[in-house]
Amino acid sequence: MDFSRRSFHRSLSSSLQAPVVSTVGMQRLGTTPSVYGGAGGRGIRISNSRHTVNYGSDLTGGGDLFVGNEKMAMQNLNDRLASYLEKVRTLEQSNSKLEVQIKQWYETNAPRAGRDYSAYYRQIEELRSQIKDAQLQNARCVLQIDNAKLAAEDFRLKYETERGIRLTVEADLQGLNKVFDDLTLHKTDLEIQIEELNKDLALLKKEHQEEVDGLHKHLGNTVNVEVDAAPGLNLGVIMNEMRQKYEVMAQKNLQEAKEQFERQTAVLQQQVTVNTEELKGTEVQLTELRRTSQSLEIELQSHLSMKESLEHTLEETKARYSSQLANLQSLLSSLEAQLMQIRSNMERQNNEYHILLDIKTRLEQEIATYRRLLEGEDVKTTEYQLSTLEERDIKKTRKIKTVVQEVVDGKVVSSEVKEVEENI
């Protein structure tokens, strides 16, 4: 129940004048308080109405009239006071009902004991373990795929290396074939030379035989004259010597050609052996480097997969906590707004209660004063004022405080507080 304006006026005055020489006689001036109440308890005012009573020469009759008016005013005041006391009791009952409702609301919205989510926690842990197993399996599959790719790359490199070795050996064989062809041509030339020398030797033998035969024929027709002369040349021996000489030369050239071919072959074989050993050492180093690279690549992939899973888990945790923080922030804002509303209601009801209690106290004081007046305790000859309560304006204001917060990802980015004061 709202009271926008309450004013109380109370003044009692009594005056007793000496009789004057007139037909009017004695006059008595009194004040009778009256209470005005608006709709819904608004604009309640207790004011005084002034009554003028004319007395004649008979003071006894005037006193009875004064007593009757006072009784009627007190009866009217008592009736109105009873109605206001009834309103006060009604407001107290409504206040107690509101207190009960507030208590029930606190009991209803108070944080309760949490449910038993242990079964759900177990399911969540099982699902998390399954997710981790699946992530590990995926990581293993990725590592196997990477290992297969690395093995394929290794085999491809081996193939390229073997292909290069084969091309090198083929090039060496082609060079050796050229050398062999050169040696074959040189051997053929030597054989041709030997054949020509054999032909020359045969021709020389034939000519020598013809000469010998001619000499025999010539000697057969002539006289045998023995002359003591130096022995003649033996052409057969000479031819044999020439043949042996040319055979030795041919054998020597052939041996030199063979030795040169063997030397070149040995040099090439040594070069091939050295290159093969160097290639094998390089291949061993390359294999070790590949193994190291594969192990490092596998370790890198495992760390990357672990990092990715941890980042994903961190993002999920951040999102979950951000949503929970936003929910808690909204709940806190709503609870603060409700608490502010409840506090404002309680303050308003407390003010109303104190105002009504003040009204009740003052009315009881007025009733006691009127009772003393009726009993004749405070009758005096002079006019006096018992108490005067100046009209006062009781203004009640309502202050509404609005808190606007902008929450992004669970963090308060901006906060704005607005206060609005309203007259009730």
From Swiss-Prot:
Sequence segments annotated as region (Coil 1B): 124-215
Phosphoserine: modified positions: 13
InterPro entries assigned: IF_conserved (IPR018039), IF_rod_dom (IPR039008), Keratin_I (IPR002957)
GO MF annotation terms: structural constituent of cytoskeleton
Residue ranges of the region described as Linker 1: 106-123
Pfam family of the protein (one): Filament
Chain intervals for the UniProt region annotation (Tail): 378-424
Region of interest (Linker 12), ranges: 216-238
Impact noted for substituting residue 4 to R: In a colorectal cancer sample; somatic mutation
Ranges for region Coil 1A: 70-105
Chain positions covered by the region annotation Coil 2: 239-377
Compartment(s) where it occurs, according to its Swiss-Prot or TrEMBL record: Cytoplasm
Protein modification: Hyperphosphorylation at Ser-13 occurs during the early stages of apoptosis but becomes less prominent during the later stages. Phosphorylation at Ser-13 also increases in response to stress brought on by cell injury. Proteolytically cleaved by caspases during apoptosis. Cleavage occurs at Asp-228.
Main location: cytoplasm
Classification via SUPFAM superfamilies: Intermediate filament protein, coiled coil region
Domain IF rod: 70-381
GO process annotations (BP): apoptotic process; cellular response to starvation; epithelial cell differentiation; intermediate filament organization; regulation of protein secretion
A single Gene Ontology CC term: cytosol
SMART domains named among the record's database cross-references: Filament
Tissue expression summary: Expressed predominantly in the intestinal epithelium. Expressed in luminal cells of colonic mucosa. Also expressed in the Merkel cells of keratinized oral mucosa; specifically at the tips of some rete ridges of the gingival mucosa, in the basal layer of the palatal mucosa and in the taste buds of lingual mucosa.
PANTHER family per record: INTERMEDIATE FILAMENT, KERATIN, TYPE I CYTOSKELETAL 20
Subunit structure, interactors included: Heterotetramer of two type I and two type II keratins. Associates with KRT8.
Family the UniProt entry places it in: Belongs to the intermediate filament family.
Other known facts: There are two types of cytoskeletal and microfibrillar keratin: I (acidic; 40-55 kDa) and II (neutral to basic; 56-70 kDa).
Function: Plays a significant role in maintaining keratin filament organization in intestinal epithelia. When phosphorylated, plays a role in the secretion of mucin in the small intestine.
Listed name of the protein: Keratin, type I cytoskeletal 20
Organism from which the protein derives: Homo sapiens (Human)
Lineage: Eukaryota, Metazoa, Chordata, Craniata, Vertebrata
